């Protein structure tokens, strides 16, 4: 396959994808997809399971080189998954700076952990963290790299409802503070509307719909415009309005 992945910010977009295709055997998961994300823009990506959302995110994160087309992404980018993927044999603070050049910088790790509200857990082993704390540690690990692009692959899916609400608020706050572009893959329509500047719907390997979100922040699910947008997105997803969030 012809692979062209460029790490650059010398374009007006934080992400520029042209003619992207990815096949697994005879099945074409992504089919000539185009996508642009502006610097500092928060974009949420919705779609049915298996439509190619996570594959797209992995390509943008340079975790899947077997694609056709052109992908332009920032040199500084980070990714956080649904599973925090912390190394169990390293303390939390060490996990945060794992992979950074030079000697492990504890102070840098502590600053990142403080920012996500778990500075007091720097010296514990990952196995003693709650699900919400582990996800915060994963966010700290991503943000300590000072990314221009943050890729989030269903980071809240395994959290209970209350912890999920807190995690959503934290991500919104961190985005405002850091100003990086974010691409969030999610199955939760309300989450997408609450957080994003723009919501995309992926179907049959392409971006089938763009929905700009012009609501003021913080957003209210009881707002009639919120309900209208939710209904429109559910229509694109082929879901009855009373059947999903």
Swiss-Prot record:
Its EC number is 7.6.2.14. The keyword Nucleotide-binding applies. The complex is composed of two ATP-binding proteins (SsuB), two transmembrane proteins (SsuC) and a solute-binding protein (SsuA). It catalyses: ATP + H2O + aliphatic sulfonate-[sulfonate-binding protein]Side 1 = ADP + phosphate + aliphatic sulfonateSide 2 + [sulfonate-binding protein]Side 1. Part of the ABC transporter complex SsuABC involved in aliphatic sulfonates import. Responsible for energy coupling to the transport system. ATP binds at residues 47-54. The keyword Endoplasmic reticulum does not apply. It is an enzyme of class 7 (translocase). It comes from Paracoccus denitrificans (strain Pd 1222). Belongs to the ABC transporter superfamily. Aliphatic sulfonates importer (TC 3.A.1.17.2) family. Keywords: ATP-binding, Cell inner membrane, Cell membrane, Membrane, Nucleotide-binding, Plasmid, Translocase, Transport. PROSITE patterns: ABC_TRANSPORTER_1 (PS00211), ABC_TRANSPORTER_2 (PS50893), SSUB (PS51291). This is Aliphatic sulfonates import ATP-binding protein SsuB 2. It is found in: Cell inner membrane. It is a peripheral membrane protein. One of its GO terms (cellular component) is plasma membrane. Residues 15-229 form the ABC transporter domain. GO terms for molecular function: ATP binding; ATP hydrolysis activity. InterPro entries: AAA+_ATPase, ABC_transporter-like_ATP-bd, ABC_transporter-like_CS, ABC_transporter_ATP-bind, P-loop_NTPase. Gene3D superfamilies: P-loop containing nucleotide triphosphate hydrolases (3.40.50.300).
């Amino acid at each position: 396959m012809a692979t062209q992945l460029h790490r650059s910010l010398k374009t007006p977009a934080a992400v520029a994808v042209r003619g992207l295709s990815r096949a697994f055997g005879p099945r074409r998961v992504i089919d000539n997809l185009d996508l642009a994300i502006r610097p500092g823009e928060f974009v949420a990506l919705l779609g049915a399971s298996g439509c190619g959302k996570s594959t797209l995110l992995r390509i943008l994160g340079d975790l899947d080189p077997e694609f056709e087309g052109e992908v332009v992404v920032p040199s500084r980018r980070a990714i956080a998954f649904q599973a925090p993927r912390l190394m169990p044999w390293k303390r939390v603070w060490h996990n945060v700076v794992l992979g950074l050049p030079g000697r492990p910088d504890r102070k840098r790790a502590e600053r990142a952990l403080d920012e996500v509200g778990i500075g007091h857990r720097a010296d514990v082993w990952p196995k003693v963290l709650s699900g919400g704390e582990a996800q915060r540690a994963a966010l700290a690990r991503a943000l300590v790299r000072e990314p221009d692009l943050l890729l989030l692959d269903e980071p809240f899916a395994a959290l209970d409802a209350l912890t999920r609400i807190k995690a959503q608020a934290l991500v919104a706050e961190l985005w405002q503070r850091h100003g990086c572009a974010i691409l969030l893959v999610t199955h939760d329509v309300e989450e997408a509307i609450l957080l994003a500047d723009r919501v995309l719907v992926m179907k049959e390997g392409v971006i089938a719909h763009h929905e700009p979100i012009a609501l003021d922040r913080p957003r209210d699910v009881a707002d009639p415009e919120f309900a209208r947008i939710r209904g429109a997105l559910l229509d694109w997803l082929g879901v009855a309005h009373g059947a999903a969030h």
